[in-house]
Regions:
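Sparse recognition of residues in long alpha-helices and their boundaries
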Residues: 35, 168, 172, 196-197
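Beta-strand->loop->alpha-helix junctions that form or flank phosphate-binding loops
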Residues: 12-14, 121-124, 170
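Conserved AMP-binding/adenylate-forming
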Residues: 1-83, 89-92, 105-106, 115, ...
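AMP-binding/adenylate-forming catalytic core of the ANL superfamily
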Residues: 46, 51-52, 67, 73-164, ...
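Generic structural signal for residues in well-ordered beta-strands
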Residues: 20, 118-120, 169
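Acidic/polar alpha-helix N-cap and adjacent early helical turns
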Residues: 190-200
Length: 200
């Protein structure tokens, strides 16, 4: 039942005996949390957290911080003590020294007329790190060519910072999804890279 201890769409509240921190993913110090509402990596500590990987000290040190904090790889926001999923750390796009969270850009573009679905991925871009690319499925009846990169950027600029705006737009027929309905950004990225290679 809904109540003060539940929020629709939230990950929820930590279990008893479980400590959580939301920290900078590039400098995951449990003593320095990001401000509420800001995205950060979720750290978890408690009796249910495993002690490490069997005979793999390097993987253990990468996953478990001093003090028993587990790096989950989940990018979350905390608001009123509730946690909200933002992205996975491995899907973060690094462009020009800025972190771009694909789900934030996707939400902005998805609200655009003519766009049924969208995935945002990073493509290799030399000195800039990665280029932000949007791959979108158009709504039925949308005229091909009516949803342009310029129109997408203009629409999304009201909701996301300029550095997060896409620099490439691909229109695709169908969005690749997992069996549970999650967008397969890795597959989208491979499709876009294959198209770019064909174009030369």
């Amino acid at each position: 039942p809904m109540g003060p201890s539940r929020r629709l769409g939230a990950l929820g509240l930590p279990f008893p005996s479980t400590d959580v921190r939301v920290v900078d993913p590039e400098d995951p110090d449990p003593e320095r949390e990001v401000p509420d509402g800001e995205p950060g990596e979720l750290l978890v500590r408690g009796p249910q957290v495993f002690a490490g990987y069997w005979e793999d000290e390097a993987a253990t040190q990468a996953a478990i911080l001093p003090g028993g904090w587990l790096r989950t790889g989940d990018i979350v926001r905390r608001e009123d003590s509730f946690l909200w999923m933002a992205d996975r750390k491995r899907e973060l796009i690094l462009t020009g020294g800025f972190n771009v969270y694909p789900s934030q850009v996707e939400a902005a573009i998805r609200s655009m007329r003519g766009v049924a679905d969208v995935a945002v991925v990073g493509l290799p871009d030399g000195a800039m790190g990665e280029l932000v690319c949007a791959a979108g499925v158009l709504t039925e009846g949308t005229v091909p060519g009516s949803v342009t990169l310029e129109a997408v950027r203009e629409h999304a600029e009201r909701m996301v910072p300029r550095y997060a705006l896409p620099h490439r737009l691909e229109v695709i027929e169908e969005m690749p999804r997992s069996q549970i309905g999650k967008i397969l950004r890795r597959v989208v990225r491979e499709q876009v890279l294959a198209r770019a290679a064909e174009e030369g």
